[in-house]
Amino acid sequence: MLLNTKQMRLRRAKATRIKIGNSRQFRLSVHKSNNHIYAQILDPSSNRVIVSASTVEAEVKKQYPSGGTIEAAKYVGHLVAKKSIESQIYEVAFDRSGFKYHGRIKALADAARSAGMKF
């Protein structure tokens, strides 16, 4: 059975989420589209969103009208880290949702780390 690109990404994401779910840590989940990038911190017990940031938000959109850039991803990473530290969440497991750790995903992760998050 041949899988297309999206099916392969979802398969990788499922395997990663099983490993993260067993660790019982807060999860920094990242999703990207061609035009935007989204980051959420989820509670390990109830899978509810505690903190979120994305390029759709007015604050980010004002500075970066095109949300599909590496600079916008860095800003979202910094913003989600700042919000999580305000919520007293310092350590998370990074869930890249099956995307390659490259480009915008890497930029978001590096910005979150430099803002004080540990993963």
Swiss-Prot record:
<dbReference type="GO" id="GO:0022625">
    <property type="term" value="C:cytosolic large ribosomal subunit"/>
</dbReference>
<keyword id="KW-0699">rRNA-binding</keyword>
<comment type="subunit">
    <text>Part of the 50S ribosomal subunit; part of the 5S rRNA/L5/L18/L25 subcomplex. Contacts the 5S and 23S rRNAs.</text>
</comment>
<dbReference type="InterPro" id="IPR004389">
    <property type="entry name" value="Ribosomal_uL18_bac-type"/>
</dbReference>
<dbReference type="GO" id="GO:0006412">
    <property type="term" value="P:translation"/>
</dbReference>
<dbReference type="Pfam" id="PF00861">
    <property type="entry name" value="Ribosomal_L18p"/>
</dbReference>
<comment type="similarity">
    <text>Belongs to the universal ribosomal protein uL18 family.</text>
</comment>
<keyword id="KW-0687">Ribonucleoprotein</keyword>
<keyword id="KW-0694">RNA-binding</keyword>
<dbReference type="GO" id="GO:0003735">
    <property type="term" value="F:structural constituent of ribosome"/>
</dbReference>
<keyword id="KW-0689">Ribosomal protein</keyword>
<dbReference type="InterPro" id="IPR005484">
    <property type="entry name" value="Ribosomal_uL18_bac/euk"/>
</dbReference>
<comment type="function">
    <text>This is one of the proteins that bind and probably mediate the attachment of the 5S RNA into the large ribosomal subunit, where it forms part of the central protuberance.</text>
</comment>
<protein>
    <recommendedName>
        <fullName>Large ribosomal subunit protein uL18</fullName>
    </recommendedName>
</protein>
<dbReference type="GO" id="GO:0008097">
    <property type="term" value="F:5S rRNA binding"/>
</dbReference>
